[in-house]
């Protein structure tokens, strides 16, 4: 029996090894490609500034700047995701009040919320205390709020529901299915690709949020409260 067990383990390891190596190669490629892209983007940005100084059509310059900004954001997200994949993003933990963190971020993004005609409504407990890394949770909540700002349709309200050990951020959305929600944390997944082109979404934000949660022993889930209402729940495991 022992011999059979050893043989099965060896066969399994051999079968799995190519898959593991392939995943590792893909991760390394993303990391290397992201670093390589940063230099030409910096050159393009400098050239665009030069075109602006030379009196080139403002619409052309502004369009270039928007695309460069979008690419820079994508590269930064890819690098961040790569660091989490490699386990480099772990850090010290402490008691963190997620409600306070969310309110601080809302105050920072208030001009953008006002510009979009959006409101943030807080309900439930005054605090949500969990033991985690504050910087990581700040980034996670920022991603969720940014996602809500981009994709809220209909009722212009982002909801923040606090309980003792969980925080939920919700918004009205285009009609979605449970299958779509089940894929929402997949890398580069887009519920509506045409809408992502207009909002500037890269399809990586929620993947990064999920990776942050996993790295910091926090559970992040997405659920439909109705066909046109989604919420993201941060909770202790």
Describe the predicted segments one by one.
Residues 94-95, 114, 119-129, 163:
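Conserved catalytic submotifs in the C-terminal HATPase_c
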